[in-house]
């Protein structure tokens, strides 16, 4: 038995959440170099608090690498409804990665894939080597829940999480975590802009998958459904198949990473230097507290 505890952080979710929490008041915390730091400031607060809360031995922060992925090849309009990031956020992507690295945290991203796919790949890769906690604001990652993987969903404020295990997810929804893929395939996702089956909403999608467990079994028993539902699914088969592929997190991204690479040791001096260099305020005391805990 090992005592490894791996924290997989959805860097995109933390940074976006942190940015918009203060951007609504136009509080961009611009430093002397003219670079906004509000998103990075909040990102670091979320990140350090997660490390304090879950006390991992290993940490990886995962990122999107550009706006286009293999999902755009499957469906041209995937996420096409999303507007471009605000100009004040754009320079903070690289700054957030730099900040995480200076703390001693490994960053991972892979062109053509989303942060979710990197998280799923690492969760699969290290399932036999560590207990894994995923920190995110994205419910799509609940499909990754297993006996070895829990998911901490960010709630309002910093340090507030709703932690799911495979068991608590089933208790809440009546389906197994992997079934979330088929549910999303049926109902679609307006945020990611894929259609699902026209006329099938969330309530019906959950009901159908609770009863039939998978889309494959649902299709085998299509004749048992009410005529209206049969017609909707038959007419939407191609969208259903495509949406299923879009909903599933890809867990075999070719990442070159060992668990040893992700070992976390707080780099206090270089982290403090980075904060001073970029004039990121209010973080150093959090680091000192974290460092004191590590020394003990």
UniProtKB/Swiss-Prot annotation:
The family database entries (CDD domains) matched by this protein are listed as: H3TH_53EXO, PIN_53EXO
Role: 5'-3' exonuclease acting preferentially on double-stranded DNA.
Q: What is its EC number?
A: 3.1.11.-
Q: Where is the 5'-3' exonuclease domain?
A: 175-262
Per its UniProt record, what Pfam families does this chain match? 5_3_exonuc (PF01367), 5_3_exonuc_N (PF02739)
Q: Which SUPFAM superfamilies match?
A: 5' to 3' exonuclease, C-terminal subdomain (SSF47807), PIN domain-like (SSF88723)
The name on file for this protein is 5'-3' exonuclease
GO MF entry, a single one: 5'-flap endonuclease activity
SMART domains, A to Z: 53EXOc, HhH2
The record's keywords, sorted A to Z, are: DNA-binding, Exonuclease, Hydrolase, Nuclease
* Enzyme class per UniProt: hydrolase
**InterPro entries, from UniProt?**
5-3_exonucl_a-hlix_arch_N, 5-3_exonuclease, 5-3_exonuclease_C_sf, DNA_polI_H3TH, FEN, HhH2, PIN-like_dom_sf
Q: Name one GO biological process term.
A: DNA replication, Okazaki fragment processing
């Amino acid at each position: 038995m090992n005592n490894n505890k791996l924290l997989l952080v959805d860097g995109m979710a933390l940074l976006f959440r942190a940015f918009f929490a203060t951007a609504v008041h136009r509080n961009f915390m611009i430093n002397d170099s003219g670079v906004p730091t509000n998103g990075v400031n909040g990102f670091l607060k979320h990140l350090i608090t997660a490390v304090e809360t879950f006390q991992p031995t290993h940490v990886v922060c995962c990122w999107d690498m550009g706006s286009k992925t293999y999902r755009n090849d499957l469906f041209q309009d995937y996420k096409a409804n999303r507007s471009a990031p605000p100009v004040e956020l754009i320079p903070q992507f690289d700054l957030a990665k730099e900040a995480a690295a200076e703390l001693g945290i490994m960053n991972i991203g892979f062109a053509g894939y989303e942060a979710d796919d990197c998280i799923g790949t690492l969760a699969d890769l290290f399932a036999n080597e560590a207990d894994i906690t995923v920190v995110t604001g994205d419910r799509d990652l609940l499909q990754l829940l297993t006996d070895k993987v829990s998911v901490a969903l960010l709630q309002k404020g910093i340090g507030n999480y709703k932690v799911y295990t495979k068991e608590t997810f089933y208790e809440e929804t009546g389906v197994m975590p992997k079934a979330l893929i088929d549910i999303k395939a049926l109902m679609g996702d307006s945020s990611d802009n894929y259609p699902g089956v026209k006329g099938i909403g969330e309530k019906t999608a959950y009901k159908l998958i609770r009863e039939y467990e998978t889309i494959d079994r649902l299709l085998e028993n299509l004749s048992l459904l009410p005529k209206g539902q049969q017609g909707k699914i038959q007419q939407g088969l191609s969208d259903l198949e495509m949406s299923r592929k879009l909903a599933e997190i890809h867990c075999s991204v070719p990442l070159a990473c060992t668990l040893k690479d992700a070992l976390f040791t707080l780099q206090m001096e270089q982290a403090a230097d980075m904060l001073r260099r970029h004039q990121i305020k209010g973080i150093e005391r959090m680091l000192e507290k974290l460092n004191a805990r590590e020394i003990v």
